[in-house]
């Protein structure tokens, strides 16, 4: 069953009220097949606002389980030992490499799926609760030090105020440092998404055309000087619809050029600025749930990302 994702910001012609359609999934019982349970789990994930990528990954993992046990296997007959044997099969006997990161996600899938079945009363206990979770840690993201941020902003301000005015570097970098946007989100900004009615408190509406990603839509504050910088930028570049009417590669060149002038030898990327923004917000006392929403991350993705941000923002040991 496919469920429609309600957009955060209604578009023209759309009503403001929206009621979720009733579930069409039949009530599950201990005798229900694994296939039926997976269908019900899909409905649950949609209504819990799991991201499209998370839903796709979890369903892929459960398809592997169904191939191993059989689609018609009653869920009450899938015990802890069956799940352990399945994980051993994935690691050593499937014939396809299973990276630590993939293995860790598949354990997470089993835990989330069977915990849901137990909480719904479909099965008496959770067979995945005893599985040992071995999370695959990603390397700590690179962030800018405070001195590097200062050097970067000095360069962008000089370019904006020099003989040959170029406001784009300052607009781009202050935007990313303040909002923590992804590259895709940055490229999708339309001029109509920016509200400068109150210049010192300008607002950006992060929107998605893809209905599957509309749970990521959000309303973000912009830097106090954004409206002034935007005015200079619009006069210089005169974009018609989107804020940045160029290729992503073009903006990457802008970041690389400014980083070189600022003496940042490791270079500069959208992701590095995004993580720098997150660390600075965390240090400033932004609550964890608000920071997750600001970054547009799912609860599953946030588990590891929060640990990394907390470590980078905290004091040295």
Q: What are the functions of these language-model segments?
A:
Residues 167-168, 247-248, 265-285, 295-301:
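Short basic/aromatic active-site micro-motif
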